[in-house]
Every structure is written in structure tokens, then in C-alpha cells.
Amino acid sequence: MRLIIITGTCGAGKSTVRDHLAKRLDPDKFVCIDTDEVGINWWDYAGTDHEEHFSDDCLAEAVRLANGHDLVFVSCINPQDYIGRHTIPAEIESTVFIVLCPTDEVIYQRLQARPAERGFTTEEAIRPHIEYNQWIRKNRGKYPLFIDNSEQTEEQTATKVAEFIEGL
């Protein structure tokens, strides 16, 4: 199975693109799964001695749900952590990262616009996501597909991503 990870900071547009891809990509070849869909709750890990296993467990469950199809996995997984720290399920033969990276201003606006229960109500809550976005942008040449989707519609971004995936 091939693993195509669509990553970026919170507010980058990953879940929105996933919704479009699920309608566009051939379901006999690809399964699109968002971290939020695997049924694993971050708060069961936060502050525990196994916090670092959250991403591994989400990925393992997504692989199981994909049932042998190529997996388009929407997640905030940091590519550096994926290579250096994560346990990769044996079913994964290759991994490709697609990065969504709008401007910091767009990230800020999107996070501020979210409902209060999502937790982005203070500058302190938003700052780490802006910093992660800056790190991603600084490393833009390391990804096979890097998209600044600040000025693109959801459909335009999804089309670029789908065409790239279909060409793999």
C-alpha cells in the first residue's frame, strides 16, 4: 500500500481538501481518511506517558480501515517526526508527503474563525501553529508537492492534489 500524507498545520485546509478528494479519487484505488475519522481521541493520550503513540495509533488504524487500498491520510504529522520517530505499519510500501501551506495571516484568520470549543481563542493557542507553518514553508523544497493555497479555492487546491495523486 502507498501512503499519501496530506499535511500542514491546523487551519491549512487539509480536511476541506479531503472532502473534495473523497468524491474525486477512484474508491477502488484510494481511501481518504482524516485523523479525526479514525476514532482515536487525543485527550486519551495528552499528558500521559504514551502521548507520543497518538500519531502511530492513528496511522495504524487508518491503514487497517484502508483495507489494502492506497491511503490518502490527512494529518498534521510532521514529516521529520514521521521519518525519525514514528512506527510505520508493515503494509506501507512507500510514503509521499503533500503539504498545504497558506500564509501565516490566512492560518491566523482561519483559526480565529473556528468555534471557541476548538481552543483557538488566544494568541498563545495560535502561535505554535503559525510557527509550525513557518517551519513547513522554510522546508518547502523537501516535499514532492507543496501548495500555498492562500489564494486558491478549495476546488482548485483539491484538483492539484488529486492530479498529483493520480499521477503517482
Question: What residue ranges belong to the model's regions?
Answer:
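Conserved substrate/cofactor phosphate-moiety recognition/catalytic segment
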Residues: 18-64
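Switch/connector loops and helix/strand junctions flanking conserved nucleotide-binding motifs
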Residues: 104-111, 156
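Glycine-rich phosphate-binding loop used to anchor ATP phosphates in small-molecule kinases
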Residues: 53-94, 100
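Conserved AAA+ ATPase "sensor/coupling" helix adjacent to the nucleotide-binding pocket
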Residues: 110-118, 164
